[in-house]
């Protein structure tokens, strides 16, 4: 159904800010280009091998846990930037839903709160509120752009200072 499809699209968009923007930039600032590359390799390996299959059981677990470890700070930084656009509701949703999964639900709950919509992955989690519609997807894209601009601006400023 469309509301769950829209929910999944916005959830993916919010989580990928951390995975594709904040994480690499964070590790670039700490360890230069090598940090960003290692982060992206680990994140990609988690996506490829992090699921439980007999063939990749141990390697997949290692990738998934290492990715969890590397994302502890970037996921929370991402959520903090997102809630700049509606601090009260964003913080309320992070407090309520942020800890459901170790990292991904922080930016997801921040997006959910700022946009004032609920998310649901049937059988896994449900964030309070009406499920998103098509207009909410466009609002999410606008929020995404604003968050990315802030993240890039901060990194550029830090690079100029250091």
Which residue stretches match the model-derived regions?
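Hydrophobic alpha-helical transmembrane segments
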Residues: 1-37, 42, 50-162
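Glycine-rich phosphate/dinucleotide-binding loop and adjoining beta-alpha-beta core of small-molecule
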Residues: 47
């Amino acid at each position: 159904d469309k509301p769950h499809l829209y929910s999944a699209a916005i959830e993916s968009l919010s989580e990928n800010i951390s995975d594709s923007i904040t994480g690499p930039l964070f590790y670039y600032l700490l360890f230069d280009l090598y940090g960003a590359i290692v982060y992206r390799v680990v994140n990609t390996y988690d996506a490829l091998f992090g699921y439980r299959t007999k063939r990749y059981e141990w390697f997949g677990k290692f990738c998934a846990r290492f990715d969890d470890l590397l994302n502890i700070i970037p996921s929370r930084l991402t959520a903090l930037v997102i809630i700049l656009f509606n601090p009260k509701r964003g913080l309320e949703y992070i407090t309520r839903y942020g800890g459901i999964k170790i990292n991904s639900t922080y930016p997801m709950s921040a997006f959910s709160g700022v946009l004032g919509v609920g998310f649901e992955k049937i059988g896994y989690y449900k964030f309070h509120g009406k499920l998103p519609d098509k207009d909410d997807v466009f609002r999410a894209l606008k929020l995404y752009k604003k968050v990315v601009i802030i993240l890039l601006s901060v990194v550029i400023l830090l690079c100029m200072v250091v």
